[in-house]
Amino acid sequence: MKQLAFVFFLATALVATPSLGQSLSTAGYEFVDAVKKSDGNKAIEVLSTHPPGLVDTKDGDGNTGLIIAISRSDEQWTGFLLNKGADPNLAGKGGDTPLIAAARVGFESAIEWLIGGGAKVNGTNRMGETPLIVAVQQRNLPIVRILLNQGADPDRADHAAGYSARDYAQRDARARDILKLIEDKKPKGAAAAAK
């Protein structure tokens, strides 16, 4: 009988009290909304009164504040979110990582910041695209150079067409400079094998 009374008490207490997840959901919505509206005061207010993981909250489309800021090439917000501990590898809509999102919009400074913050240069989205594949498709030579210098694999194929960054560059007559850069860059394993 005591056990039944305890279960009843516990059930009543749980129904009457909003869960931690519910309160974080509201705060998460407020935070992402502040990022979308570029409302720095609101973002700081919400972050200062909630757990640090809130910075990685996703919106209804599945994008984090970091990906939202990167998508609009917003240096101030991207830097702010990275300084607040945003995960540089947390994928958003379509599985795009922040690094893929930055390559897609040609946001060069974000590429450097993300890599400096531990972003995986060979991370993929749901279609198997890497940041390097996206940069090649965008014909963005400076970003291709940065990614290759940071160890991006030009021979990793995507799932969509089965092509690698090298393959895409070979197939695009307007990407000859990019192809040359890829061809001139020795794979990481080649230097070790030569020793």
Could you tell me what each predicted segment is?
Residues 39-48, 74-82, 107-115, 140-148, ...:
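Ankyrin repeat structural motif
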Residues 70-79, 83-84, 90-118, 122:
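Alpha-helical adaptor scaffolds
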Residues 21-33, 150, 160-161, 167-195:
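Ankyrin-repeat-protein effector appendages
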Residues 33-39, 68-74, 101-107, 134-140, ...:
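Ankyrin repeat A-helix N-terminal signature
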Residues 53-55, 88, 121, 154:
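Ankyrin-repeat inter-repeat connecting loop/turn
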Residues 5-16:
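Bacterial N-terminal signal peptides
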Residues 59, 92, 125, 158-159:
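Ankyrin repeat boundary/linker residues
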Residues 27, 62, 95, 128, ...:
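Start-of-repeat signature of ankyrin repeats
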